[in-house]
Every structure is written in structure tokens, then in C-alpha cells.
């Protein structure tokens, strides 16, 4: 087997993966875009079974910090809109990215409150509480590190419930503190809850679309418990009423999409119930309900939870809750993507440019792979040296395929040649290639990250297709510089068009990934020449001009 046949192996692996990816998407199709109708009712057998309320109408207040711009409904105190000023919606735009939204076309909210027997958010106790607030707009002032937004509600019995949002400068984690003052003569039983609800279908302004060959990051729900560090839960599964019902101490529930996430983290020592629910009207939910707390007459009870609403910044998320950083979707190759990202981030701390960091990490990866690359070319050279003997054996044995196979294996053993030695290094490199793809598509740090010249976003395709063309050129040179024993006309035609085929594939790939492949090909050319010189000294390679 020679290096050109190895390109066929790469193509087979690559196309096979793309077919598998397409099959996964067909098996779990995304529903067609449709209009979502806001509703104040809850589907039977869903969140109502948890004593969790539906949405309601109230006054909207705004809260602005240096990193968050939220809209909170005083009816229940739900976060109904979240803008992220530090992250533009599109490259070059002044419009901030919108994470949470409440419109006729799309619903994505972070709900929270107090349920339980005496909780004001329990549907059995009437409409959700209409909180009183001091003002309609809260702003984190310059020089201020913390902003508190207190909301109070007093029920007919004179019990006072206070819900306070606590924001900190530069932080996407929002603490929600509850205070329950029991003015009656009987204990009050309340439970905190946190629920994330979202329309399954994406409206046009949120559906960014995808290229024909792009891999897709996960959009859906997830949860974590001490026993199950990270489990995904598809929206389609919830919509089919195959719902989650797990009890756990600690953990969190979340909704994920590319680069961004929302999560509720209960802060208590008791047991929490994690659930999902189909709310009807194309809306699904994931949430938690905490173990009930008793507040004695004349006493004040305190409870708290934390809402994460923002980008998937791994180190910050890990500091908020165990395993919350796992929400960064690196796919099934996360065990390779994670260390690659940590290495890339460490390099970036020195060079300050993600593009140059990718170039450096390419040299590191190819340096580590060099022994395998050398073994690959050595194996291919030995296979070429055996071709005359193999051809003579085939002529001698004619159509006796069984004897041909037996004698060929004996020849490989005698000459100490592994017929698969040329493929193995390539098979190892494919997971690294795909892991880098997932890393580029899942790491918020690389979103809108510029490199140089016309490349302003390493996570997006090259707008002028220059990098894919350069990649095809480097692939062409590698092919022309590689000795070949391919004699089959069909294989020769395939090999001729292989650089063109790969160039077409790479047109829609992230420019950071194409940059990696270009540099990798250039390193391959250099390593190839160094290895060939060593093989020449051993009589395993000749600089004869390659036959066309």
C-alpha cells in the first residue's frame, strides 16, 4: 500500500463519517419552523404534576450589568429576555446576542419561585404572585460590584415572600435568594423550583441554517447528578412525553445550544427532583423542585438557587457547579477535544492570536505523530520493494486466490512487513482532525475570533474560499511527490480528482480547521522529504521521477 492509496483510506473514513452524521440527523429530524402561541395553561401530566406554574402577565422590569441585559416579569419573577452585550449577534454587528426570548414566534424563559403546599407559585393557591418592586429599571453603576433586585409579595394571610436577584460584575451566574416571613399561626411548607422552557421549533431569525457538510452541536436539555455527571436529553424525547424523573442531592438542569447555555443550580442540602415536561403548543421544559422546607410561625426562612445565563466559558462554569463545564458540546470525541482546547488556550495566553495558536498546536501534534508518520512511510517503502515478488507470485499461482493469500502472508512475515502499517497512522489522525472540528464548533472563545487578513472568524467558513483552495494545492503537491504503485485506471482517476473533492468538502468547514489542515500538509511535505532521505540511505527509496 502506498501513500496515494492512503488518501483513498482517508476519503473513505471521511465520507463514511459524513454519511453517519447525515443519518443521525435524519433519524432525529428537526421539526419544521412554526409559530408558537404563548399560553398560560399547562399540559396535563407535565409540569403541573410537579406543582410548577405556567407563565402569566405582569409588569416588565429591566436589569443591566456589564455583561447581562435582562427583562424580568413581576408576575412570578421569571426572566423572559436575556441579551448578552459582550457577544454580538453576528460578526461586525452592534446588536447583542439574544439568549432568552418571549415573543409570539419563540419562547425561551428561565422560571423560578416557591411551590409546595403553601408556596405562592403553587397553581393550587391561585395565580402566580405579582411582586412589588422599587423601580422599573436597575443598572449596575460604574464602580459597583454587586446589584440586588428585591421583589416582594404579601399574601392574604399576611405572609411576606421576598425574591431577590443578586448580580455581580462580570458574572453570568445570578443568585436568586428567597425569604419567607411566616405571619400566621401554622408552619408554612414551601419548595424552591427552577424551570427552563423553550419552543422546540426555531423561528427563522434564530435558525442560522447549516452547510451541507457541517457537523452540528447539540441543542436540547441536559442534567447532572453525583451519579451521572452529564446526561443529554433531546427536545424530541421530551416532546414525545418520554420524561425525566430523577431525585438527587446536588446537580443541575440546563438547556444548551451552540456556544451558550442556561442552567438552574439548586443550593440546598436536601433532595431535588429533576424532571422534564411537554408543556404543549410546541414548548418543552426541564427543571428541578427542591425538598420542602418548613417555616415556623413568627420565623423567617431563607433559600437560594443560582441561574447561569450566558456563554459556555468552561473555567467560569466549573467554578459555579461541578461538571457544568461539560455542557460545552465536544461530541463523542470530547476526551480528545478537551485536552486539545486546554493546550490551545495555554498557547493563546502567550501568542494572543487564536489562528497562530492553531498553527503552533498543529506543529505540536505533527511532532508527536512523527514516529508514526515515519513508520507509515517506511512500511509503504517496504511494500513497494515487495511489489516485484508479489507480482511474480500472482503470475505463478494464477487464479488460485487461497494460495495467493497464504503465500502473501508468509512473504509479509518473512520480510517483517505489516500490510496495514501505512493505514494505521492515518486512522489515528482522523479522530484528532474531527476532535479539532468539534473544538472549533463548540468553544465560545473561538466564536468571531480573528486570525489575519480576510479571516475574521476562525469558527466560520472562509468567505472567499482561499484557504480551501490552498489546502487543495498542498494536497496536490503531496500526491505528486508520493511514489505510487497504483495501476488500476479507476483508482488513478479517483486519485487525480482527490484534491478537488477534498477542496469542495472543505469549502464549508471552519476556516480554523482548514488552516490546521494546510499547516499539517506543509509539515507533511517537510517530514516526507526528511524520511525519504533516510530511506534512500537504506535502499528503500529512489528519487526516480514519478510516472504520470
UniProtKB/Swiss-Prot annotation:
Map out region (Disordered) in residue numbers.
28-56
Say where the protein is mainly found. membrane
Report TM segments: 6-26, 350-370, 424-444, 458-478, 499-519
Q: Which UniProt keywords apply?
A: Cell inner membrane, Cell membrane, Chaperone, Membrane, Protein transport, Transmembrane, Transmembrane helix, Transport
Q: Return the Low complexity bias intervals.
A: 29-42
GO BP annotations of the record are:
protein insertion into membrane; protein transport
Give the domain of life.
Answer: Bacteria
Q: Gene Ontology cellular component?
A: plasma membrane
The entry assigns this protein to a family as follows: Belongs to the OXA1/ALB3/YidC family. Type 1 subfamily.
Q: What does this protein do?
A: Required for the insertion and/or proper folding and/or complex formation of integral membrane proteins into the membrane. Involved in integration of membrane proteins that insert both dependently and independently of the Sec translocase complex, as well as at least some lipoproteins. Aids folding of multispanning membrane proteins.
- Assembly state and interactors? Interacts with the Sec translocase complex via SecD. Specifically interacts with transmembrane segments of nascent integral membrane proteins during membrane integration.
Entry protein name? Membrane protein insertase YidC
Q: Which organism is it from?
A: Salmonella enteritidis PT4 (strain P125109)
Amino acid at each position: 500500500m502506498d501513500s496515494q492509496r492512503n488518501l483513498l483510506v482517508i476519503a473513505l473514513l471521511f465520507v463514511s463519517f459524513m454519511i453517519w452524521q447525515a443519518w443521525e440527523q435524519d433519524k432525529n429530524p428537526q421539526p419544521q419552523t412554526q409559530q408558537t402561541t404563548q399560553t398560560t395553561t399547562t399540559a396535563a401530566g407535565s409540569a403541573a404534576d410537579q406543582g410548577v406554574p405556567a407563565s402569566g402577565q405582569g409588569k416588565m422590569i429591566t436589569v443591566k450589568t456589564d455583561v447581562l441585559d435582562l427583562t424580568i416579569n413581576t408576575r412570578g419573577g421569571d426572566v423572559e429576555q436575556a441579551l448578552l452585550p459582550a457577544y454580538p449577534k453576528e460578526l461586525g454587528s452592534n446588536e447583542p446576542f439574544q439568549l432568552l426570548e418571549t415573543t409570539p414566534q419563540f419562547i425561551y424563559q428561565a422560571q423560578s419561585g416557591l411551590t409546595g403546599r403553601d408556596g405562592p407559585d403553587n397553581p393550587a393557591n391561585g395565580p402566580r404572585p405579582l411582586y412589588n418592586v422599587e423601580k422599573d429599571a436597575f443598572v449596575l453603576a460604574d464602580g459597583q460590584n454587586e446589584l440586588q433586585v428585591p421583589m416582594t409579595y404579601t399574601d392574604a394571610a399576611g405572609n411576606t415572600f421576598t425574591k431577590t436577584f443578586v448580580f455581580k460584575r462580570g458574572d453570568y451566574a445570578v443568585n436568586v435568594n428567597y425569604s419567607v416571613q411566616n405571619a400566621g399561626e401554622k408552619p408554612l411548607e414551601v419548595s424552591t423550583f427552577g424551570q427552563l422552557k423553550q419552543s422546540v421549533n426555531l423561528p427563522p431569525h434564530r435558525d442560522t441554517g447549516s452547510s451541507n457538510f457541517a457537523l452540528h452541536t447539540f441543542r436540547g436539555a441536559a442534567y447532572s447528578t453525583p451519579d451521572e455527571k452529564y446526561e443529554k436529553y433531546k427536545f424530541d424525547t421530551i416532546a414525545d412525553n418520554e420524561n425525566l424523573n430523577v431525585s438527587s442531592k446536588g446537580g443541575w438542569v440546563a438547556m444548551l445550544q451552540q456556544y451558550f447555555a442556561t442552567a438552574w443550580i439548586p443550593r440546598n442540602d436536601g433532595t431535588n427532583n429533576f424532571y422534564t415536561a411537554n408543556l404543549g403548543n410546541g414548548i418543552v421544559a426541564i427543571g428541578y423542585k427542591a425538598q420542602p422546607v418548613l417555616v415556623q410561625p413568627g420565623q423567617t426562612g431563607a433559600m437560594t438557587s443560582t441561574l447561569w445565563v450566558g456563554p459556555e466559558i468552561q473555567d467560569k462554569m466549573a467554578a459555579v457547579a461541578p461538571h457544568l463545564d461539560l455542557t460545552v458540546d465536544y461530541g463523542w470525541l470530547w476526551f480528545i477535544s478537551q485536552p486539545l482546547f486546554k493546550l490551545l488556550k495555554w498557547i493563546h495566553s502567550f501568542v494572543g492570536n487564536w489562528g497562530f495558536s492553531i498553527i503552533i498546536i498543529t506543529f505540536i501534534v505533527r511532532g508527536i505523530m512523527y514516529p508514526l508518520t515515519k513508520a507509515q512511510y517506511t512500511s509503504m517503502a517496504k511494500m513497494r520493494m515487495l511489489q516485484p515478488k508479489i507480482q511474480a507470485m500472482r503470475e505463478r499461482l494464477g487464479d488460485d486466490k487461497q494460495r495467493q493469500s497464504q503465500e502473501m502472508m508468509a512473504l509479509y512475515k518473512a520480510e517483517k512487513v505489516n500490510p496495514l502499517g501505512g493505514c494505521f497512522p492515518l486512522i489515528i489522525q482522523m479522530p484528532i482532525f474531527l476532535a479539532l472540528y468539534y473544538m472549533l464548533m463548540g468553544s465560545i472563545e473561538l466564536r468571531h475570533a480573528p486570525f489575519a487578513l480576510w479571516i475574521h472568524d476562525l469558527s466560520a467558513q472562509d468567505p472567499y474560499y482561499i484557504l480551501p483552495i490552498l489546502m487543495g494545492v498542498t494536497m496536490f503537491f503531496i500526491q505528486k511527490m508520493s511514489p505510487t504503485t497504483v495501476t488500476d485506471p479507476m483508482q488513478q482517476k479517483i486519485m487525480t480528482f482527490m484534491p478537488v473533492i477534498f477542496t469542495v468538502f472543505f469549502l464549508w468547514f471552519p476556516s480554523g480547521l482548514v488552516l490546521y489542515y494546510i499547516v499539517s500538509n506543509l509539515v507533511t511535505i517537510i517530514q516526507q522529504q526528511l524520511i525519504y532521505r533516510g530511506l534512500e540511505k537504506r535502499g528503500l527509496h529512489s528519487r526516480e521521477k514519478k510516472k504520470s
